[in-house]
Amino acid sequence: GAIRNLLKEGLKHLHRSSWPGVQALQQLAGLGDRPLVADDIGFQLAPRINAVGRIGDPVLVVDLLTAEDQDQAYELGRRCDVLNRQRRDLCDAIEAEAIALLDSDPSPLPPFVLLAQSHWHHGVIGIVAARLVERYQRPAALLAADGDGFMRASVRAPEGFAVDEALKHC
């Protein structure tokens, strides 16, 4: 509908944004000066922004998107880029550890994967849980310490599995 058309039109013009922060993100993502498509947003720009909220201070993104100076915007964008690489590395390491934990157990895989490690970063366990669902085709819950003495959980499940209903029976 109307929102979809508005987004399509906005994508056509985003690459010509006068905002230094948007320009910096596009440059760091290697998108050049061409019209953007949805995949550019979903796989290049959004992850750089999202990573900051997952493992850093979200104020960084506010500062980036409101920066008026190109050099300052580029430096802030570079910091977002670094956090995105760190986020990817964290996800890969946690996924490898989770797979090793599951594969090292000789018993059959349970119908619901549940893993907890205090050293995992709580900001990325949802991404890893989704990867485990894809790999093992069953619901997965990962828990990580939040730094305040509590564990945070993230649960993902295959399509058609109602996590909220399952949790009501716990």
Could you tell me what each predicted segment is?
Residues 1-170:
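Hydrophobic helix-and-loop "lid/oligomerization" segment in the mid-to-C-terminal part
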